[in-house]
Amino acid sequence: MSATSSWYFPNGSLSAPNQPLALDVKRAGWTYCGIDVYSFSAKNKEIEIDLGNREAVVVPLSSMSATIKHHDKKYELAGRPGVFAAVADWFYAPAGSKFSLAAESGEVAVCTAIATKEFAPHHGLASSVPVEPRGAGFATRQVNNIATPDSFAAADRIIICEVLTPGGNWSSWPPHRHDGIAGCPNMNEEIYYFRIGKQNSDHGDAEGRGYFHAYTVDKKVDDTITLNDGDVYILPAGYHGPSIAAPEYPMYFLNVLAGPAQDRTMAFCDDPSHHWIRDAWKTQKQDPRVPMTSASGRVNNS
């Protein structure tokens, strides 16, 4: 089955000059979340960003470094050659910020959420990002908890994490939702920004393939997507999972979440048909390929 909803955006369908990805709330057709990915080169080394009523988390994807000038302070972010190469530094910019973002080359993500409260800017070090092996067996994956409620409290609505899945494994499993309907009290919009690698690649590869399933409670949306590197899927509602990494094609996705709750939360409701899987993990070992990366680079688990 192919995509039947308007929630799937193939790579390039949301591009702009020097922006492989430009997704705001208007284009998404919802209230809170957005993401921009900027591409830097000799002809485009610096951009100016005005957040207005949004807060943001800046994450280098394939830039070795990025410089942020926020008011009278300069922040030097340690980057990486690609999302499969290492964990990177990150930066939180509060609502109302105007700042410049500069890099010599590569891509940098600016994740946003509508905000009503203002917090202080923050430079997060890669070495301080909690790296969590999650799941077990063929559902073992790595979660980099960049700006989650537990890892970073000083934000209004935005929640950011990265998930890396070894080739042949599943993530987003069991299927779960956080749409505030049909008995699930938790409400967050969510963006999935996918990069599909190739064996031993630092970043995404055009040959990479993966798979993703999403469906609503009423089954009016039931999408099974063949993913290419750089694709986006947005989730205003419904169950999502699994995200499947094909053998030898590791999968990365950057999640951006935000919702109306006064207190940020990552709570969700499993599909009751598959909740039992969490108990099955108790008797399974985690895949030794996880974690795949750290602040220092690739993790050698051989």
Q: Model regions: which residues?
A:
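A short glycine-rich, His/Asp/Glu-containing loop-to-beta-strand
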Residues: 14-48, 141-191
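Extended, compositionally biased flexible segments
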Residues: 33-102
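Glycine- and acidic-residue-biased ligand/ion/polar-headgroup-sensing regions
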Residues: 47-75, 167-168, 179-232, 243
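Conserved metal-binding segment of the jelly-roll/cupin
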Residues: 84-104, 113, 226-247
